[in-house]
Amino acid sequence: DNLDQNWLMKFLEHDIADKNFLRYIGRFLKAGVMEGTELQDSDRGTPQGGLISPVLANVYLHYVLDQWYELGLKKHLRGEVYYVRYADDFLLMFQYENEARMVMELLRKRLSKFGLELAEDKTRILSFGKYARSKEEFDFLGFTFFNRNS
Protein backbone atom coordinates (compact mmCIF):
# COMPACT_ATOMS: atom_id res chain seq x y z
CA ASP A 1 0.00 0.00 0.00
CA ASN A 2 1.93 2.97 -1.30
CA LEU A 3 -0.68 5.63 -1.88
CA ASP A 4 0.33 9.21 -1.24
CA GLN A 5 -1.51 10.52 1.83
CA ASN A 6 -1.29 14.13 0.65
CA TRP A 7 -3.04 13.27 -2.60
CA LEU A 8 -5.62 11.22 -0.69
CA MET A 9 -6.44 14.19 1.54
CA LYS A 10 -6.80 16.44 -1.54
CA PHE A 11 -9.19 13.94 -3.09
CA LEU A 12 -11.24 13.74 0.12
CA GLU A 13 -11.32 17.54 0.46
CA HIS A 14 -12.83 17.69 -3.02
CA ASP A 15 -15.98 15.91 -1.82
CA ILE A 16 -16.08 16.41 1.97
CA ALA A 17 -16.76 19.83 3.49
CA ASP A 18 -16.58 18.76 7.16
CA LYS A 19 -13.13 19.89 8.34
CA ASN A 20 -13.41 17.91 11.60
CA PHE A 21 -14.04 14.70 9.69
CA LEU A 22 -11.07 15.41 7.42
CA ARG A 23 -8.89 16.08 10.47
CA TYR A 24 -9.87 12.67 11.94
CA ILE A 25 -8.99 10.95 8.66
CA GLY A 26 -5.62 12.74 8.66
CA ARG A 27 -4.94 11.58 12.21
CA PHE A 28 -5.94 8.03 11.31
CA LEU A 29 -3.46 8.05 8.41
CA LYS A 30 -0.61 9.45 10.53
CA ALA A 31 -1.26 7.29 13.62
CA GLY A 32 1.16 4.57 12.57
CA VAL A 33 0.97 0.83 13.12
CA MET A 34 2.29 -1.37 15.93
CA GLU A 35 4.69 -4.02 14.66
CA GLY A 36 5.54 -6.20 17.60
CA THR A 37 6.54 -3.76 20.32
CA GLU A 38 7.48 -0.89 18.01
CA LEU A 39 5.34 1.86 16.53
CA GLN A 40 6.00 2.29 12.81
CA ASP A 41 5.33 5.80 11.55
CA SER A 42 3.00 6.08 8.61
CA ASP A 43 3.65 8.66 5.91
CA ARG A 44 2.48 6.54 2.97
CA GLY A 45 -0.48 4.27 2.43
CA THR A 46 -3.32 3.50 4.79
CA PRO A 47 -2.91 1.51 8.01
CA GLN A 48 -3.20 -2.22 7.32
CA GLY A 49 -6.19 -3.67 9.11
CA GLY A 50 -7.80 -0.26 9.54
CA LEU A 51 -11.56 -0.53 9.12
CA ILE A 52 -11.74 2.39 6.69
CA SER A 53 -8.50 1.62 4.83
CA PRO A 54 -10.25 -0.21 1.95
CA VAL A 55 -12.70 2.68 1.54
CA LEU A 56 -9.87 5.22 1.48
CA ALA A 57 -7.94 3.14 -1.06
CA ASN A 58 -11.08 2.98 -3.20
CA VAL A 59 -11.48 6.77 -3.07
CA TYR A 60 -7.83 7.15 -4.09
CA LEU A 61 -8.18 4.80 -7.06
CA HIS A 62 -11.44 6.47 -8.06
CA TYR A 63 -9.52 9.68 -8.70
CA VAL A 64 -6.31 8.09 -9.99
CA LEU A 65 -7.88 5.55 -12.37
CA ASP A 66 -11.67 5.81 -12.71
CA GLN A 67 -11.80 9.57 -13.33
CA TRP A 68 -8.75 9.42 -15.61
CA TYR A 69 -10.44 6.74 -17.71
CA GLU A 70 -13.91 8.33 -17.83
CA LEU A 71 -12.99 11.99 -18.23
CA GLY A 72 -9.85 11.78 -20.31
CA LEU A 73 -8.56 8.54 -21.73
CA LYS A 74 -11.75 7.14 -23.25
CA LYS A 75 -12.40 10.26 -25.34
CA HIS A 76 -9.03 10.08 -27.11
CA LEU A 77 -9.18 6.50 -28.38
CA ARG A 78 -10.72 5.61 -31.72
CA GLY A 79 -11.56 1.98 -30.90
CA GLU A 80 -13.75 0.40 -28.28
CA VAL A 81 -12.28 0.38 -24.78
CA TYR A 82 -13.66 -1.10 -21.57
CA TYR A 83 -12.47 -0.72 -17.99
CA VAL A 84 -13.39 -2.87 -14.99
CA ARG A 85 -11.99 -2.33 -11.48
CA TYR A 86 -12.55 -4.07 -8.17
CA ALA A 87 -10.40 -2.68 -5.36
CA ASP A 88 -6.86 -2.55 -6.79
CA ASP A 89 -7.41 -5.16 -9.52
CA PHE A 90 -8.49 -3.89 -12.91
CA LEU A 91 -8.78 -4.80 -16.57
CA LEU A 92 -8.51 -2.52 -19.57
CA MET A 93 -9.79 -4.04 -22.80
CA PHE A 94 -9.10 -2.47 -26.19
CA GLN A 95 -10.26 -3.04 -29.72
CA TYR A 96 -6.84 -2.10 -31.12
CA GLU A 97 -3.53 -3.47 -29.89
CA ASN A 98 -1.61 -0.27 -30.69
CA GLU A 99 -3.95 1.67 -28.37
CA ALA A 100 -3.42 -0.92 -25.63
CA ARG A 101 0.36 -0.47 -25.92
CA MET A 102 0.09 3.32 -25.89
CA VAL A 103 -2.21 3.31 -22.84
CA MET A 104 0.12 0.90 -21.01
CA GLU A 105 2.82 3.59 -21.10
CA LEU A 106 0.38 6.37 -20.16
CA LEU A 107 -0.88 4.21 -17.30
CA ARG A 108 2.62 3.69 -15.92
CA LYS A 109 3.17 7.46 -15.90
CA ARG A 110 -0.25 8.11 -14.35
CA LEU A 111 0.30 5.62 -11.54
CA SER A 112 3.84 6.87 -10.90
CA LYS A 113 2.55 10.43 -10.47
CA PHE A 114 0.44 9.18 -7.54
CA GLY A 115 3.06 6.89 -5.97
CA LEU A 116 1.72 3.66 -7.45
CA GLU A 117 3.01 1.11 -9.94
CA LEU A 118 1.73 -1.80 -11.97
CA ALA A 119 2.24 -5.32 -10.63
CA GLU A 120 4.42 -6.51 -13.51
CA ASP A 121 3.70 -10.18 -12.80
CA LYS A 122 -0.02 -9.49 -13.35
CA THR A 123 0.33 -7.04 -16.24
CA ARG A 124 0.28 -8.06 -19.90
CA ILE A 125 -1.28 -7.37 -23.24
CA LEU A 126 -2.91 -10.34 -24.89
CA SER A 127 -5.19 -10.97 -27.84
CA PHE A 128 -8.57 -12.18 -26.72
CA GLY A 129 -11.80 -13.10 -28.47
CA LYS A 130 -12.82 -15.18 -31.43
CA TYR A 131 -10.16 -13.66 -33.72
CA ALA A 132 -7.30 -13.97 -31.22
CA ARG A 133 -4.05 -15.36 -32.57
CA SER A 134 -3.26 -17.35 -29.41
CA LYS A 135 -5.29 -19.20 -26.82
CA GLU A 136 -3.89 -17.49 -23.71
CA GLU A 137 -6.02 -17.32 -20.62
CA PHE A 138 -6.01 -14.98 -17.64
CA ASP A 139 -7.23 -14.84 -14.06
CA PHE A 140 -9.26 -11.95 -12.67
CA LEU A 141 -10.90 -11.84 -9.25
CA GLY A 142 -10.54 -15.58 -8.75
CA PHE A 143 -11.98 -16.54 -12.13
CA THR A 144 -10.04 -17.93 -15.08
CA PHE A 145 -11.03 -16.56 -18.48
CA PHE A 146 -10.32 -18.96 -21.33
CA ASN A 147 -9.72 -17.78 -24.87
CA ARG A 148 -11.74 -20.11 -27.09
CA ASN A 149 -13.60 -19.72 -30.36
CA SER A 150 -16.88 -21.16 -29.10
Language model features: what each stretch is:
Residues 1-128, 132, 137-140:
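Conserved polymerase palm-domain catalytic core
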Residues 139-150:
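Active-site and adjacent loop segments of nucleotide-processing enzymes
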